[in-house]
UniProtKB/Swiss-Prot annotation:
InterPro entries: 6-hairpin_glycosidase_sf (IPR008928), 6hp_glycosidase-like_sf (IPR012341), CBM_49 (IPR019028), Glyco_hydro_9 (IPR001701), Glyco_hydro_9_Asp/Glu_AS (IPR033126), Glyco_hydro_9_His_AS (IPR018221)
Glycosylation (residues): N520, N540, N561
Family: Belongs to the glycosyl hydrolase 9 (cellulase E) family.
Places the protein is found: Secreted
Top-level taxon: Eukaryota
Gene3D superfamilies for the chain: 1.50.10.10
Organism per entry: Oryza sativa subsp. japonica (Rice)
Entry protein name: Endoglucanase 15
Enzyme Commission designation: 3.2.1.4
Classification lineage: Eukaryota, Viridiplantae, Streptophyta, Embryophyta, Tracheophyta
A Pfam family the protein falls into: Glyco_hydro_9
Keywords: Carbohydrate metabolism, Cell wall biogenesis/degradation, Cellulose degradation, Glycoprotein, Glycosidase, Hydrolase, Polysaccharide degradation, Secreted, Signal
Residues forming the catalytic site: D87, H421, D473, E482
Length: 629
């Protein structure tokens, strides 16, 4: 369960790959890791998270049916779906994001999944989620977004088959809107409709009907879902708002239908809803902007932009900001641990590693086969094969190539977490011992045990290590030992990509290939939004002094509107590497904003602020969002 440890920080592309491109860019399943095995385990994990009536072909044998009366008190059938993590609550927002990312993985790398014998299992995992969403959407303007609540759930430690906690259902409707929840669910059903189009066309059409209704509902009745379903706020609060989900849903509906009204929505609302303004290096269940930007870039590179090329170009610039920041070639970069893992936060950091790895993989693949070539970053070009090599390093870190030698995928390798923070896995299976485990008995008899869990949560990707690569395998260390569905979902596509045989390409040939430059066949563009010409940032040292044998530097920063005849509004700045105090800006959700008395910068006007740094190296300052009016 996220407990506000999810995606709140500053913050794919389709097309199955041609074999020639796969040979050129591919990795070998044989560089020390069995990616096909990791893929099988990662998909299997979703069966351990199932709620509802389990089918005869259930492969995780220690689980049994649960939540069989969900929704009954509300007069609706809400049996089914997924538990989000190590608890027994069904949270709609992360569940929908999970299904969206599983679907996207299949759409990009379904052939590779089929080659590994896992495509059917992956599709079954998607359908388990979409079957539930159909139930949760009984009317066009009603969507049930949660069953159970985190507060009562956390007071008990029980198997899902035994749970006695509240199963109250919570919904959004016109009087209690939830645009982010409804739009993410619309995105999930639109993406899934493409997955099932060739095998279950009737089901695919039904998903599209629900998706269109949910998008219309989300757009018409605007509001954050956690203002309506307040019990979700402390666990999956909507910190990024609903603008990213509205754009995300529109992009997926365009992909699913080719209805250009959705593309017009995406292009026409890019500024108002943040898609063309925000440059963010974090992607997850809350912040969807990088995913939207990569999808929009795909439409542009495929020649599907039509009259909206200029708007989609701005999306693409932000997508490349994300790529450059992740691979370490941006104006500001994602931090890395000493062992090389991308690092955002202590609580469930690996969710961001897997989601970023997926976006990087699809962007690199599509850039290569479309002729786009290298991504031009502030610190140098990022070739597609360099991006993929970096992705491989992140996946290998998860699978055990890290300073601890620990695999953070349960059941993979010889050394992996044994005390996963998970109710069902940590208590003896009900099939082995059907004796009822009460709310507090679970805590007294099972939660505090020093032994490993009696049931293997095979394939689960846990939260992972901290910024120093340290990890404590303890059940009560939920920040590091709890797994979540949205950790695994993006990883499916990446593992399928890595598991591909790639024509027998050897590692030494791959290394030789990385030294060969790729010709860029298209015009280059900055990875940053159009701030290089519209907004200028200049830093200067204006004073120094010594205190207690340390030298302090006073920096003056000038931010200037360089546009021609346009006023800059809603300016947001990102700041990293700051070791002292800052004056002249106000803190905001994703960085800093100008003081309230300066709501706009007219052409040629400047904003000035200062900070003190106990080192000669300046802080990194960049523009994360703005509007030109």
């Amino acid at each position: 369960m996220a407990k506000n440890g999810g995606a709140h920080g500053a913050a794919t592309l389709f097309g199955l790959l041609a074999l020639a491109s796969m040979v050129k860019l591919g990795f070998v399943a044989g560089g020390g890791h069995d990616y096909a095995m990791a893929l099988r385990k990662s998909i299997l994990y979703f069966q351990a998270q199932r709620s509802g009536v389990l089918p005869p072909n259930q492969r995780v044998s220690w689980r049994a049916s649960s939540g069989l009366f969900d929704g009954k008190a509300n007069g609706v059938d809400l049996v089914g779906g997924y538990y989000d993590a190590g608890d027994n609550v069904k949270f709609g927002l992360p569940m929908a994001f999970t299904v969206t990312m599983m679907s996207w993985s299949i759409l990009e790398y379904g052939k590779q999944m089929a080659a590994a014998g896992e495509l059917r299992n992956a599709m079954d995992a998607v359908k388990w989620g979409t079957d539930y969403f159909i139930k949760a959407h009984p009317e066009p303007d009603v969507l049930y977004g949660e069953v159970g609540d985190g507060d009562t759930d956390h007071s008990c430690w029980q198997r899902p088959e035994d749970m006695t906690t509240s199963r109250q259902a919570f919904r959004v409707d016109p009087q209690h809107p939830g645009s982010d929840l409804a739009a993410e669910t619309a995105a999930a059903m639109a993406a899934a409709s493409i997955v099932f189009r060739g095998t279950y066309p009737g089901y695919a059409n039904l998903l599209l009907v629900h998706s269109k209704q949910l998008f219309e509902f989300a757009d018409k009745y605007r509001g954050k879902y956690d203002a309506s379903i307040t019990v979700a706020r402390n666990y999956y609060g909507s910190f990024s708002g609903y603008g990213d989900e509205l754009l995300w849903a529109a992009a997926w509906l365009f992909e699913a239908t080719e209805d250009r009204s959705y593309l017009e929505y995406l292009a026409g609302n890019g500024e108002a809803l943040g898609g063309t303004g925000w440059s963010i290096n974090q992607f997850g269940w809350d912040v969807k902007y990088p995913g939207v930007q990569v999808l929009a870039a795909k439409f542009l590179l495929q020649g599907r932009a039509g009259d909206h090329a200029a708007a989609l170009q701005r999306y693409r610039q932000n997508a490349e900001f994300f790529v450059c920041s992740c691979v370490g070639k941006g104006a500001v970069n994602v931090a890395r641990t000493p062992g090389g893992m991308m690092y955002h936060q202590r609580w469930n950091n690996l969710q961001f590693v897997t989601s970023a790895s997926f976006l990087l993989t699809v962007y690199a693949d599509f850039a290569a086969i479309s002729g786009r070539g290298a991504v031009h970053c502030p610190a140098g070009a990022a070739q597609p094969f360099d991006i993929l090599k970096f992705v491989k390093s992140q996946v290998n870190y998860i699978l055990g190539d890290n300073p601890r030698g620990t695999s953070y995928m349960v059941g993979y390798g010889a050394s992996y977490p044994r005390q996963v923070h998970h109710r069902g896995a940590s208590i003896v299976s009900i099939k082995r011992d059907p004796s009822f485990v009460s709310c507090q008995e679970g805590y007294s008899s099972w939660y505090g045990r020093e032994a490993g869990n009696p049931n293997l949560l095979d394939g689960a990707v846990v939260g992972g290590p901290d910024e120093y690569d340290d990890f404590a395998d303890e059940r009560d260390n939920y920040e590091q030992t709890e797994a979540a569905t949205y950790n695994n979902a993006p990883l499916l596509g990446v593992l399928a990509r890595l598991a591909a045989s790639c024509g027998g390409l050897k590692e030494e040939e791959y290394e030789q290939e990385t030294a060969t430059p790729v010709v860029n066949r298209t015009s280059s563009s900055s990875s940053l939004p159009a701030t290089a010409t519209a907004i200028g940032i200049e830093q200067n040292v204006t004073g120094t002094w010594a205190r207690r044998r340390r030298t302090y530097y006073r920096y003056a920063v000038t931010v200037t509107n360089r546009s021609r005849g346009k006023t800059v509004r809603e300016l947001h700045l990102g700041v990293s590497g700051l070791r002292g105090r800052l004056w002249g800006l106000e803190e905001a959700r994703y960085g800093y904003v100008p003081p309230r008395w300066l709501p706009a910068l007219r052409p040629g006007r400047s904003l000035r602020f200062v900070y003190v740094q106990p080192a000669p190296a300046p802080a990194n300052i960049w523009v994360t969002g703005y509007k030109l009016v």
